């Protein structure tokens, strides 16, 4: 088991303007690869509340600007108001919602390994982390990958998969398999 070293301050995560990501600020999470797009929330199963975490693509039915997210710290003592590399955060869609669906905006991973909403801030299994990548993508800087890091289990990369006709975010078992992300201030 590794413990956080109190004296170790991890590097900040940066958006496309070169500014550190701030807790509680709104961002669009975007896959910068050609043909890919921003992450968004949608209802694809006739559910009471939308809960699918999808990725826009450069094809007509999947075009779009994305749904803003906010990052929430795991605990108040976590490194001030900036998001840092490999530090536990909760990811929450910033959307207008009904009273009924107000608790359906925090990301989690379901039994099918799909990223969905319905997570809870405070639930150790709904934690995500951000890791820097070495990818060089033209016109982009600060390219990262997202990891799902449930309590007592190994972190898994977030990748994408077409499931039931939709580009879904999923966890993947292969360390080399992931989709890159950049963060754009919303």
UniProtKB/Swiss-Prot annotation:
Q: Which cysteines link up through disulfide bonds?
A: 49-101, 149-155
**GO CC annotation:** vacuole
Keyword Oxidoreductase included in the entry's annotation:
no
Which Pfam families is this protein grouped with? Kunitz_legume (PF00197)
Q: Does the keyword tRNA processing apply?
A: no
Q: In the record, which residues are listed under signal peptide?
A: 1-7
> Which InterPro entries does its entry note?
Kunitz_inhibitor_STI-like_sf, Prot_inh_Kunz-lg
* Main localization of the protein described in the UniProt heading: other
Write out the annotated subcellular location. Vacuole
Return one GO MF term. cysteine-type endopeptidase inhibitor activity
The alphabetized UniProt keywords are: Disulfide bond, Protease inhibitor, Signal, Thiol protease inhibitor, Vacuole
Q: Give the PANTHER family listed for this entry.
A: CYSTEINE PROTEASE INHIBITOR 1, KUNITZ TRYPSIN INHIBITOR 2
What does the protein in this record do?
Probable inhibitor of cysteine proteases. May protect the plant by inhibiting proteases of invading organisms.
Q: Which family does it belong to?
A: Belongs to the protease inhibitor I3 (leguminous Kunitz-type inhibitor) family.
Q: What is this protein called?
A: Cysteine protease inhibitor 10
Organism in which the protein naturally occurs: Solanum tuberosum
Q: Organism classification, top ranks?
A: Eukaryota, Viridiplantae, Streptophyta, Embryophyta, Tracheophyta
